[in-house]
Amino acid sequence: PKGVMPSTQGNPNRLNEDKIMFGVSASINVESENESTNDTRVGVEFAMLKNKLYLGAEAYYMNVGFTDRQKINESYNYLGGYVQGGYFVAPRLQAALRYDFFNRNGTGDDGFLNMPAVGMNYFFKGCNLKLQAMYQYIARTGHDTQLDRDNDNLGLATHSATVMLQYTF
């Protein structure tokens, strides 16, 4: 509604923007060789840039239906999403927060992944280079018992830190 939304989550050269975006998406993926799954995905999205502030959120639903060849009669439904924000605390330094959630076991089973994260982005001047650092905590919640929660691990790290150098062109 306020013009074209730039495809960025913040840019130190565009700190006077006032943009907003709403989106709806849907897709149906049909397995052509009848080997795996037929999937339906639906989502909604929001993003906003207002001066030094960036906000974004997305929610999605997915239905996974197995083909006859897979010999699995069940279909599974999943919900997930995220909320994130960034704010330029200095001319080239952006602080960021993010919260993801996902019920990777399907809506029929208890258990959610909750993934809060904190990060910083530093934008180098005049070279389209960005240094990103993020810490993320992965929690498993909503299980019936502590044993169910412990068994729903799959080797996921509880704590992770990522540092990335990104060049755009």
Protein language model regions, located:
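Residue-level signal for short segments within beta-strands and strand-turn junctions
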Residues: 61-63, 122, 137, 167
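Outer-membrane beta-barrel proteins, especially TonB-dependent receptors
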Residues: 8-17, 25-27, 31, 140-141, ...
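Outer membrane beta-barrel transmembrane domains
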Residues: 82, 86-140
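Extracellular loop and loop/strand-boundary signature of outer-membrane beta-barrel proteins
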Residues: 68-72, 104-107, 143-153
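Transmembrane beta-barrel architecture of outer-membrane proteins
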Residues: 39-41, 78-80, 113-117, 158-162
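Outer-membrane beta-barrel "beta-signal"
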Residues: 120, 124, 129, 153-169
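Detector for outer-membrane/organellar transmembrane beta-barrel domains
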Residues: 1-105
